[in-house]
Amino acid sequence: MWPQPRLPPHPAMSEKTQQGKLAAAKKKLKAYWQRKSPGIPAGANRKKKVNGSSPDTATSGGYHSPGDSATGIYGEGRASSTTLQDLESQYQELAVALDSSSAIISQLTENINSLVRTSKEEKKHEIHLVQKLGRSLFKLKNQTAEPLAPEPPAGPSKVEQLQDETNHLRKELESVGRQLQAEVENNQMLSLLNRRQEERLREQEERLHEQEERLHEQEERLCEQEERLREQEERLCEQEERLREQEERLCEQEERLREQEERLCEQEERLREQEERLREQEERLCEQEERLCEQEERLREQEERLCEQEERLCEQEERLCEQEKLPGQERLLEEVEKLLEQERRQEEQERLLERERLLDEVEELLEQERLRQQDERLWQQETLRELERLRELERLRELERMLELGWEALYEQRAEPRSGFEELNNENKSTLQLEQQVKELEKSGGAEEPRGSESAAAARPVPGAPVPQGAWMCGQAGWTPQEHPGLSGEAVGTGEAAGGAEEAACHSFRAAENRELNITII
């Protein structure tokens, strides 16, 4: 019996283990996504509650700007939302990659199984053929071993036939052996392919592990972001202290503004000097234009003279035609014509040169004017921008002074015992005026710069204008209420009514102050 060839190992077990590992990895990713699907960290709700606290709970010793804290915390919330969106996109990419890899693996396994089946069937068929050939050879050997009776030589003997059959069978065996070797090599190639696929699956599993590690790192980053949010809350408190320092710096900026105003005055003087220079240049241009006109008139006179000379030449030619009999006169005529042509050429060249020179001078003057105009426009634009900046800074400083003076007046009035309805009425009117000014500033903040300057001018007190009764008057000592002529110091209302009106005025003034601080921060 012929020895059977060794078959490659069956890849069913390895495929099952690979599919099980892929399913486990998918389950882990789904569980991770379900855990992280809400997308809101635990500390966010707590921080929103902290930010939602009313601004009226501030102490009397200092004021807190809720706009700053809200902007800082919500800014970090947006950053956390962006990280969660990145995680979602990465998870979707991983899911797509897993689906594509699983589909590719399933296709490869199906192809491998089909190839293994076909190879097994072919091997069985070839083994069956080899067995048949072996049996036939065994029979032939037995027949050749038995003694045969001599027969008459009627044709080819049986021994020769058997030898031919054996030779034919040997050739078939050799061909079958070659086919078996080729199949063995194919099986080896298939085994190599299976090994490579297993290595790829292992690499994919390693990638999945790396992605899980990245997800864990992202979780740690989210925790770090929460810690950063807490640090930002502490920074907000520090910013409040910095705002106080900025108020001191504003005083220094006022001095700088005065210096800038002096510089602007100098710039205006320079602009006036430039205007005078431009006027002088315009006068020069007018003079140059007059010169050009005079030169054109001269050229016209020269052209008229040339025409007269041509007429004279024509007359001379006629005379020469009459005197054609004389040979010497013909030579003279030719020489005269040559001289006249030379004079004409020289005059034309001189005219062309003068025209080109005049055109070059005009172009140079025009370019100089254009460059000077551009310089003047740039200078004017820069001066206008500086003036607008100075106006905005002055407007902001006046508003800050108003707020500071209002705070000082409120603290002084809360410290002193009050009795009377007149002071409360003045406080309410002052707070209403401040709220109106803040609203006007909010409206004019998104408008154009000229409108902003008009609103700032409207906010300023106009000298000589009538002041409403019960309004606040700004003086050296601070804000003082104007006396109401109708009440004349009479105490109206009880202590409870006065206390309620005072609290309402404080709340309204704090709201106006918070709005103003938000505007300055923006």
UniProtKB/Swiss-Prot annotation:
| Protein's gene | GOLGA6L10
* Origin superkingdom: Eukaryota
List the InterPro entries hit by this protein, alphabetically. GOLGA6L, GOLGA_cons_dom
Name the PANTHER family on file: GOLGIN SUBFAMILY A MEMBER 6-LIKE PROTEIN 10-RELATED, TRICHOHYALIN-RELATED
Q: Which family does it belong to?
A: Belongs to the GOLGA6 family.
Query: Region labeled Disordered — which residues?
Result: 1-77, 439-503
- Specify residue ranges for compositional bias: Low complexity: 456-471, 489-503
Polar residues: bias regions: 51-62
Name the record gives this protein: Golgin subfamily A member 6-like protein 10
Bias (Basic and acidic residues) = 439-452
Keyword list, A-Z: Coiled coil
Keyword check for Coiled coil, yes or no: yes
Where are the annotated coiled coils located?
157-328
